């Protein structure tokens, strides 16, 4: 006669059977539609594309529609006007709005990138690059007050180069026109995201000489943001979104670039798979992606130090961490 399983083993078996059901039960039902806008289309946001293509959002009961804002300023406008529910933008925008008279206040609830994903390109090969080489040169930067420019200026100052006096920063070129301006001969150096950076290199139009984020260090660069009202009214949506981000970040950290590439190709039609893999490997090398969605107080303090140093914000205008970031969702998702 076969012995009956012990109560402990029977209980463990029951839990194993119920686990998938519990995971499904946690999904929002019926699914919730979320209007989402990304700041730009870039390989910098691989964890998000993986989450979309691999059904992470669907698993969580989120029906996501996506648009591309073409700039943090435009993404914030969409959020404040109510045409987007959640946006992926630079954290500096939430600090600016916190100090404004806007009755609608944005709150950061999850982080995606651990630092700046821009690469500094030179027109000619440089055997041993030094940031002092930028002195007296024309450099394609970014929109004044934007995170890309603030991070670039921080890297310059770190290496003894005054961004206001020692270099000529070209900051008036629209996002869609930047690569074209470089190809047309503007700038002796310039900062570019992937996939543009890699495309310029492969076409012999530029040479990567530095990672801006690597020079600056780990300071949150792009974050998921919603209005305080949306977060109050939809805490389950925000928690589900943050859980998805945490899941995607862990997966990207643990997965080879060659495996990730086919999972995101639908968002980069026409691109060569080998080129996408190379771009992902480059971002992995510099530890650009966060391991956890939590945006810390230390990171926000450092960012505000940078904003003050770049003279885009007065020291007296610093925002309190808890006024800009709601960390509860990220802490629960870890």
Over which residues does each language-model region extend?
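Predominant activation on well-ordered alpha-helical scaffold segments within soluble catalytic domains
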Residues: 49, 95, 153, 198, ...
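Secondary-structure end/capping motifs
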Residues: 232-314
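Short, glycine-/small- and polar/acidic-enriched structural segments
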Residues: 26-164, 168-174, 181, 188-194, ...
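Bacterial N-terminal signal peptides that target proteins for export
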Residues: 1-11
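Bacterial N-terminal signal peptides
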Residues: 11-20
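Conserved C-terminal helix/tail region of periplasmic/extracytoplasmic solute-binding proteins
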Residues: 304-334
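Sec/Tat signal peptide C-region and signal peptidase I cleavage site
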Residues: 21-25
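Pocket-lining segment of extracytoplasmic ligand-binding domains
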Residues: 93, 124, 176-268
């Amino acid at each position: 006669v076969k012995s009956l399983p012990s109560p402990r083993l029977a209980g463990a078996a029951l839990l194993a059977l119920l686990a998938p059901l519990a995971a499904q039960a946690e999904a929002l039902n019926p699914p919730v539609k979320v209007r989402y806008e990304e700041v730009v289309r870039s390989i910098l946001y691989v964890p998000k594309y993986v989450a979309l293509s691999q059904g992470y959002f669907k698993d969580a009961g989120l029906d996501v529609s996506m648009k591309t804002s073409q700039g943090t300023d435009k993404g914030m406008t969409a959020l404040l006007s109510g045409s987007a529910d959640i946006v992926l933008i630079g954290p500096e925008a939430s600090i600016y709005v916190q100090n404004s008279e806007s009755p609608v206040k944005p709150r950061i609830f999850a982080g995606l990138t651990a630092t700046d994903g821009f690469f500094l390109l030179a027109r000619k090969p440089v055997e041993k690059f030094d940031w002092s080489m930028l002195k007296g040169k024309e450099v394609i930067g970014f929109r004044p007050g934007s995170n890309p420019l603030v991070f670039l200026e921080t890297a310059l100052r770190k290496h003894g180069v005054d961004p206001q006096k020692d270099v000529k920063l070209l900051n008036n070129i629209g996002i869609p026109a930047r690569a074209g301006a470089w190809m047309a001969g503007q700038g002796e150096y310039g900062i570019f995201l992937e996939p543009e950076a890699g495309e310029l290199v492969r076409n012999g139009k530029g040479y990567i000489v530095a990672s801006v984020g690597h020079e600056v260090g780990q300071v949150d660069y792009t974050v998921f943001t919603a209005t305080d009202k949306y977060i109050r009214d939809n805490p389950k949506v925000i928690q589900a979104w943050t859980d998805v981000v945490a899941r995607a970040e862990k997966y990207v950290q643990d997965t080879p670039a060659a495996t990730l590439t086919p999972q995101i190709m639908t968002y980069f039609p026409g691109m060569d798979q080998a080129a996408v893999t190379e771009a992902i490997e480059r971002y992995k090398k510099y530890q650009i992606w966060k391991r956890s969605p939590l945006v810390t107080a230390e990171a926000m303090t450092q960012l505000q130090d940078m904003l003050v140093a770049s003279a885009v914000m007065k020291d007296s205008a610093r925002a309190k961490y808890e006024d800009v970031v709601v960390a509860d969702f990220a802490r629960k998702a870890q």
